[in-house]
């Protein structure tokens, strides 16, 4: 059975691009366009991994990451933050809140696929 990926970003072009990329890599993909929708999606059908933008309406990525990590039922969910905020302080904040990885935009599509595969392999 294919791993489930949730793509969360408020930019439709990025969502479409990542959705296509993840499906081509063999993953099941769902999408959300804001933080509230992301948490609703995680609640409805817990993914194996979340590709999570930081700057979004209705809860930012940091808040979503924190909410996922606060719920023991979602402990196994892997989180990769994808963001234009590339300063070290933002990266440290994301990792401190429980993100497993942090990739800055613009990103290499192959790098995203490889990091997703690596995290899922580590998770077992």
Provide a role label for each language-model segment:
Residues 107-117:
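C-terminal output helix
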Residues 56:
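Receiver (REC) domain active-site loop signature in two-component systems and cognate sites
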């Amino acid at each position: 059975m294919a791993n489930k990926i949730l793509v969360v970003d408020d930019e439709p072009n990025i969502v479409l691009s990542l959705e296509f990329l993840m499906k081509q890599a063999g993953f099941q993909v769902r999408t959300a366009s804001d933080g509230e929708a992301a948490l609703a999606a995680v609640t409805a059908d817990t993914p194996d991994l979340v590709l999570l933008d930081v700057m979004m309406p209705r809860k930012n990525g940091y808040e979503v990451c924190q909410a996922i990590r606060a719920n023991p039922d979602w402990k196994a969910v892997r989180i990769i933050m994808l963001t234009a905020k590339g300063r070290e302080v933002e990266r440290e904040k994301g990792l401190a809140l429980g993100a497993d990885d942090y990739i800055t935009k613009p990103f290499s599509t192959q790098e995203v696929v490889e990091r997703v595969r690596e995290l899922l392999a580590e998770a077992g």
